[in-house]
């Protein structure tokens, strides 16, 4: 049960992170929509009549339409974003999600018997009935009349597309269908899954939609003030676990409804606010966004000042730099994790107080009828765009006095609790955690090492503020080192680690992935010549490293391999063997790095760092593993002469193009490779010598 909960939490983390990709598009869309609308605002035109010029107004219309089209197609963006996030960013998953979403929508429309006349008749009626119009069950999605599944439909098909990708991206098909093998198969299977999903949702979704509508009406209609308070508390409480993205998504994108001037239904607090901003009508939305501004712009920066003031005198300079950076980040952008995690683990009582104050902030903003939109977070940038530019309708100016009051509350409450309870906030620790001074280029290498190196990483990801890593053995993770490297906090849930590095988290993740893929070399492993050329560091010790023959047969030069990929040394230098037996043994002491799914090739790494590929036969990939038996697993340690693979040589001779087996050093770089043996060779005889 415990392991099941850990896996469930890990999946929730991945889904939460995946939702950030489409959400990250919204600030750009919001800026286009806001500025485009402002450029033909009557009040602004009164002060700047020159903006009434035809071309300026045309530009404003283009900007407004460009922003609006993003909000109109959020379900599609969520489908593609969810698929990309859960499939490791591979574009094929995004294409599969797009295809799947269109097919699912078309299937639901046909099964439910929805026509385009149903859509237009509702739109015409909505113009007459206004906001009293009944919630429609139908929608027009890219010209397809279908059920109104909103962003939930996008998330569902996006997750299914990602599952199809992860399951089938390396599938092998018979030779006559070879063109459709691998990643090309993913959109095809997703199409079939989408048809089934569309059929199921045709019957399941209507009662689910009724339930969501009833829940929305209950939360927003019965006691909205209490709902905003509870929303604020839960949203902040989920921040440490990285699950807040999942929680607020229904409130922002589904709950509530508004019929715009065109007669189209708009769902979700954030989307409704944008539609009302565009229509120029009084705001009724913003209840689930406005509450962030007082504590993000004023409260938390004041808390940072309190932490700085209570630090030991000899530590204030260091703490002051950290707190100033975190406070400015919170004030300007609304990214609060670097500051929140600085006291979350060392003084949880402060975070409890912060959570309660966040809930009251949402409540007070609602009671004062302050309604400000948001696309990114509640910082000063969003405050200008979605508050001050519409101050006459949003009551945005009230944020300033309320924010000042919250700044005073945060400062004095944090000061009191820190002193009264002797909390070990930054700068007050009994044992000082020394920061490790590393360069930007060295940081991802250091973080990777602190996570237990690449063999310990099962899944690597990141969102706006945190590095999310699923490890195989969390006992290998050096939490203290991560903090020394700049993580303001490290959260552990099962084997899921979250290191809070702030806005640079995604770049660290990108660089770590590049390192793990062998695309980035450590600065410590490179030297620069006087001519400015970069040389790879030595991969073997002085005296060279010997590679022994893994197969008995005839050793020949690579130029004799009837495949240009190998004969032209596109994959690296080495040698080839025409096998006489079907046994393959380890050519050195080291580790198994990779086993191809079709079992025809195996990648090894020696203790000296030599990476070797043994590719048995040519065009053996099409055999789909038939005739091959692998005797080891990935990440197994191996010793010289250990059996790695058994091959049915007669079967390979009959069904493959050739049995000749290239043995390639894939990371030789500028190293010198000397052939020690050609002609007849026995397993275990010296075959190659690698020298720097």
Swiss-Prot record:
Membrane-spanning residues: 15-35, 84-104, 140-160, 185-205, 215-235, 287-307, 318-338, 344-364, 370-390, 398-418
Active-site positions on this chain: 463, 615
Membrane topology reported for the UniProt record: Multi-pass membrane protein
Activity control, per UniProt: Inhibited by methyl alpha-D-glucoside, methyl beta-D-glucoside, p-nitrophenyl alpha-D-glucoside, o-nitrophenyl beta-D-glucoside and salicin, but not by 2-deoxyglucose.
Keywords in alphabetical order: Cell membrane, Kinase, Membrane, Phosphotransferase system, Sugar transport, Transferase, Transmembrane, Transmembrane helix, Transport
InterPro entries: Dup_hybrid_motif (IPR011055), Glu_permease_IIB (IPR036878), PTrfase_EIIB_Cys (IPR018113), PTS_EIIA_1_perm (IPR001127), PTS_EIIC (IPR003352), PTS_EIIC_1 (IPR013013), PTS_Glucose_EIICBA (IPR050429), PTS_IIB_1 (IPR001996)
NCBIfam families noted in UniProt: EIIB_glc, PTBA, PTS-II-BC-glcB
Domain remark text: The EIIC domain forms the PTS system translocation channel and contains the specific substrate-binding site. The EIIB domain is phosphorylated by phospho-EIIA on a cysteinyl or histidyl residue, depending on the transported sugar. Then, it transfers the phosphoryl group to the sugar substrate concomitantly with the sugar uptake processed by the EIIC domain.
Record protein name field: PTS system glucoside-specific EIICBA component
Gene: glcB
């Amino acid at each position: 049960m415990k392991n099941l909960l850990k896996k469930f939490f890990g999946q929730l983390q991945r889904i939460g992170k995946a939702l950030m990709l489409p959400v990250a598009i919204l600030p750009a869309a919001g800026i286009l929509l806001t500025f485009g609308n402002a450029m033909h605002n009557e009040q602004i035109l009164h002060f700047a009549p020159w903006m009434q010029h035809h071309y300026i107004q045309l530009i404003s219309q283009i900007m407004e339409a460009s922003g609006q089209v993003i909000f109109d197609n959020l379900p599609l963006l969520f489908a593609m974003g969810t698929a990309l996030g859960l499939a490791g960013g591979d574009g094929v998953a995004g294409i599969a999600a797009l295809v799947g979403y269109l097919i699912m929508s078309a299937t639901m429309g046909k099964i439910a018997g929805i026509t385009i006349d149903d859509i237009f008749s509702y739109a015409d009626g909505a113009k007459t009935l206004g906001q009293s119009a009944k919630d429609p069950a139908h929608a027009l999605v890219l010209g397809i009349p279908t059920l109104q599944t909103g962003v939930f439909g996008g998330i569902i098909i996006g997750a299914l597309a990602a599952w199809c990708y992860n399951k089938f991206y390396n599938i092998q098909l018979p030779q006559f269908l070879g063109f459709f093998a691998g990643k090309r198969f993913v959109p095809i299977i997703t199409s079939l899954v989408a048809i089934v999903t569309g059929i199921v949702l045709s019957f399941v979704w209507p009662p689910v939609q009724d339930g969501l509508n009833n829940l929305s009406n209950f939360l927003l209609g019965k006691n909205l003030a209490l709902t905003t308070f509870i929303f604020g508390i839960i949203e902040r409480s989920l921040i440490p676990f990285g699950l807040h993205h999942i929680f607020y998504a229904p409130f922002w994108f589904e709950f509530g409804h508004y019929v715009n001037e065109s007669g189209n239904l708009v769902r979700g607090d954030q989307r409704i606010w944008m539609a009302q901003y565009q229509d120029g009508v009084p705001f009724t939305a913003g209840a689930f966004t406005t509450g962030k501004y007082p504590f993000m712009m004023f409260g938390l920066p004041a808390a940072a000042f309190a932490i700085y003031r209570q630090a030991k005198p000899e530590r204030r300079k260091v703490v002051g730099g950290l707190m100033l950076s975190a406070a400015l980040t919170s004030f300007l952008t609304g990214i609060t994790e670097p500051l929140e995690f600085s006291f979350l683990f060392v003084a949880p009582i402060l975070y409890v107080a912060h959570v309660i104050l966040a809930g009251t902030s949402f409540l007070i903003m609602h009671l004062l009828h302050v309604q400000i939109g948001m696309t990114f977070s509640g910082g000063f940038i969003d405050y200008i765009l979605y508050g001050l530019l519409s101050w006459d309708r949003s009551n945005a100016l009230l944020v300033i006095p309320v924010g000042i009051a919250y700044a005073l509350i945060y400062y004095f409450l944090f000061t009191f609790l820190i002193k009264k309870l002797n909390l070990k906030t930054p700068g007050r620790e009994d044992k000082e955690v020394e920061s490790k001074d590393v360069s930007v280029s060295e940081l991802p290498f250091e973080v990777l090492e602190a996570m237990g190196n690449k063999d310990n990483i099962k899944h690597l990801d990141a969102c706006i503020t945190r590095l999310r890593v699923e490890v195989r053995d969390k006992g290998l993770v050096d939490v203290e080192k991560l903090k020394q490297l700049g993580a303001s906090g490290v959260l552990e849930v099962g084997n899921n680690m979250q290191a809070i590095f702030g806005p640079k988290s995604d770049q660290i993740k990108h660089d770590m992935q590049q390192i793990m893929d062998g695309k980035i070399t450590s600065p410590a492993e490179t030297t620069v010549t006087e001519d400015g050329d970069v040389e790879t560091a030595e991969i073997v010790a002085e005296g060279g490293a010997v590679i022994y023959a893994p197969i008995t047969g005839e050793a020949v030069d690579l130029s004799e391999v009837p495949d240009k990929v190998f004969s032209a040394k596109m994959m690296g230098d080495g040698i080839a063997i025409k096998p006489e037996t079907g046994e393959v043994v380890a050519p050195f002491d080291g580790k198994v790095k990779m086993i191809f799914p079709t079992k025809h090739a195996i990648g090894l790494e020696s203790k000296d760092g030599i990476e070797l590929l043994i590719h048995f036969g040519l065009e053996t990939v099409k055999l789909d593993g038939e005739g091959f038996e692998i005797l080891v697993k990935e990440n197994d340690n191996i010793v010289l002469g250990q059996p790695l693979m058994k091959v049915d040589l007669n079967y390979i001779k009959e069904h493959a193009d050739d049995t000749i087996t290239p043995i390639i050093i894939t990371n030789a770089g500028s190293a010198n490779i000397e052939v020690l043996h050609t002609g007849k060779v026995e397993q275990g005889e010296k075959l190659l010598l690698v020298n720097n």
